[in-house]
A protein has these predicted regions:
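Glycine-rich acetyl-CoA-binding "A-motif" of GNAT/NAT acetyltransferases
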Residues: 58-61, 123, 136, 229-234, ...
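Conserved donor-binding loop and adjoining core beta-sheet/short helix segment
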Residues: 8-13, 20-120, 233-247, 251-256
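Short loop/turn motifs at secondary-structure junctions and domain boundaries
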Residues: 41-45, 212-217
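Acyl-donor-binding surface of acyltransferase catalytic domains
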Residues: 58, 69-71, 86, 90-174, ...
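Conserved acetyl-CoA-binding loop-helix of GNAT-fold acetyltransferases
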Residues: 90-103, 130, 255, 261-274, ...
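Short amphipathic alpha-helix that is part of the acyltransferase structural core
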Residues: 1-39, 52, 59, 158-201, ...
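Core beta-strand residues in small-molecule sensory/regulatory alpha/beta domains
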Residues: 54-55, 225-227
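Active-site/acyl-donor-binding loops of N-acyltransferases
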Residues: 131-151, 220, 274, 279-321
């Protein structure tokens, strides 16, 4: 039995296609696409690495590591994603990929990894725990069945109404609001309940990651605008699941602290739901940190159902050979 780990070059279409296919085969929720790889390479050049593992010449595993998109370059950890086909597990494939990713992280001066695993995948949880990873946080995953909503009585369909003194507009119609949306992120991100607050980054970084991204529909990206000043008070956007036009995730719902307590977040989230219904989507998914009770309460009030928790882990690099 031989295990060979190879780097996936972004300009190698065949290798990228194999990498994406393996991720999708192991976990459709963690799929990637060639378009997604191209976006990541353009947004984070030289900061993301991908690997394939071959068992006796057959591709059976994939991994990726690099800068976490929502943190600065000097964050002490890289993220780690690792996928091995079920029939090829417990044969050293995952360990070989972990070592390859660790070599890259060590060369970049990183002290460890951050990774995520769903309770729906106990093998993944066991793998990282067995290598010294510890749970750092936990997200409550939920989903909204849009097909069921369409089949319900017309009076049960959600509507979106802005609080008095505000309007809800799509960024597709008001691209001039993008700097204001960035200001929302700068003011709101530090106070969103989470173990490690996200960093919005510069306007350029934020725009590439959270606005003009290939899976973010701009006509489903809503901004709450104060009528009196024209300022952006909050925003909510969606991001399609990789390779899908039927399932999307709530990428962010954020409100500037000065405008909270008026039902703004609920109105914005409702706007994305109404858009998704009209666009023919089947489901919306959301993940919120366990301690983010305000947003979790909004999700519950809108009829989202619980899914298995997503666990965030931190852990060490593999020992040097």
């Amino acid at each position: 039995m031989s295990i060979d780990v190879r780097a996936v070059e972004a300009d190698d279409p065949a290798a990228v296609a194999t990498y994406c296919a393996l991720r999708a085969a192991v976990d459709a929720d963690e799929a990637d696409t060639p378009e997604g790889v191209a976006w990541e390479e353009a947004a984070y050049p030289g900061e993301v690495w991908r690997f394939l593992a071959l068992l006796d010449g057959e591709p059976v595993g994939a991994a990726t590591t690099g800068r976490m998109h929502v943190y600065s370059r000097d964050h002490p950890r890289f993220y780690l994603g690792l996928w091995v086909l079920p029939e090829s597990r417990r044969r050293g494939v995952g360990t070989a990929l972990y070592r390859a990713a660790s070599e890259r992280a060590r060369a970049a001066g990183k002290e460890g990894f951050r990774c995520w695993a769903s309770e729906a995948h106990p093998d993944a949880v066991a793998f990282v725990r067995g290598r010294g990873f510890a749970e750092e946080d936990r997200s409550k995953a939920v989903a909204l069945d849009l097909r069921g909503l369409r089949a319900s009585a017309p009076g049960a369909m959600p509507t979106a109404t802005a609080p008095e003194g505000f309007s809800l507009v799509a960024i597709a119609d008001r691209p001039d609001l993008v700097p204001g949306v960035h200001r929302v992120a700068v003011e709101a991100f530090p106070s969103i309940p989470t173990v490690t607050p996200m960093e919005p980054g510069t306007l350029e970084e934020f725009t590439a990651r959270d606005v003009y991204r290939e899976r973010i529909p701009l006509d489903g990206f809503f901004v709450a605008v104060e009528t009196a000043t024209g300022e952006a008070a909050g925003y909510a956007n969606l991001i399609f699941a990789p390779g899908s036009t039927a399932v999307a995730h709530h990428d962010m719902t954020a409100v500037r602290p000065a405008f909270r307590g008026r039902g703004m977040a609920t109105a914005l989230k409702r706007a994305t739901i109404v858009w998704a219904l009209g666009a023919g989507l089947d489901e919306l998914h959301a993940n919120n940190d366990e301690e983010n009770t305000p947003m979790r309460s909004i999700n519950a009030s809108l009829g989202y159902r619980s899914l298995p928790d997503e666990i965030g882990f931190t852990g060490p690099l593999a020992p040097e050979a």
